Amino acid sequence: MRSERGLSVAENKDTGFRVITSVIKPAFKMHFSPTIIGSENIPKDGAVVIAGNHKNISDQFLVFLATKRVVNYMAKREYFDGALAPLFKWAGCIPVNRDGFDAAAVRRAIKILKRGGAVGIFPEGTRNRTDKSLLAFKPGAAAIAKRGGALIVPFAISGEYRKNGNLKILFGEPFSPESMSVEEATDKLYSAVSDLLNSQ
């Protein structure tokens, strides 16, 4: 399958994995020194949506520290036009137009899942710049997981985004949204992420 940027999903995965393992992972580990808890909850294979809170542009790359799997993150299209564009492209991120429903991005995410891949989604839909621990969740993560036949693994990032900032990345137990409505699965995901944040 060809992506809209001219690279196949497989090519994006291979390139992104090499870049992240050789450069980004060591740099992020040294700069943030995060504590990773519950990474064993991420399935080693099979379709999975990894979804959690979003406060910093580094979040999707921090999640890469916790898993050897390639996670194709859904990211706003503007990132693909700026200085960080090569990083997002090489990592196999999926560009999303947030002005409305982006059917092409959803189809691409579902195809990745149906091939047994992993997709990362921030269900808040944007970075949380408020004093609230979480913004309301949009239904996209649950809907994509259901249509892609995927498990959902909740995660939470807490602490300060700096060295010695006690940054933690926590993963909860996976659950299947198959027998749930999209609304029920979204509520369960929100509760799981909230519980992870409150556990710290």
Language-model segment annotations:
Residues 2-38, 82-91:
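A transmembrane-helix-recognition feature enriched in membrane-embedded lipid enzymes
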Residues 32, 71, 167:
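Small-molecule pocket liners
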Residues 22, 29, 43-100:
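Catalytic core of membrane glycerolipid acyltransferases/transacylases, capturing the structured
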Residues 2-15, 104-200:
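Non-catalytic C-terminal accessory region of glycerolipid acyltransferases
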Residues 27-29, 66, 88, 112, ...:
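A generic structural signal for well-ordered alpha-helical segments
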Residues 40-42, 110-111:
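Short amphipathic alpha-helix with an adjacent loop that forms part of the alpha/beta core around
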Residues 32, 99-103, 134:
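A conditional alpha-helix N-cap/helix-loop micro-motif detector
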Residues 36-37, 94-97, 177:
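Short acidic-hydrophobic, aromatic-tinged amphipathic segments that line or gate anion-handling sites
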